[in-house]
């Protein structure tokens, strides 16, 4: 499942208008090299803490984890070598999207998302 998050925290963390994420089972994630660090983002619109994991060497965001989905990691798709298959299947926090961002017809958009940031 691939989605786009438009919450202000993801915008800041991505340094962009949104963050494109792919949900994967935690058991399927393998870190090939390096060490990650984590920032626990508790200043979210839902009040839930989002763990934002990033490369300890270069600072690139790798994935986010949320308490309501403990078995799923939300991988930042921009970290993948081939991003061609990551077309958005949904949008979350569309109420926070930048005014110039247009959402695709037929792709579900949730104004807010309980549990996710």
Region spans (language model):
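A short Gly-Trp-Pro
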Residues: 1-117
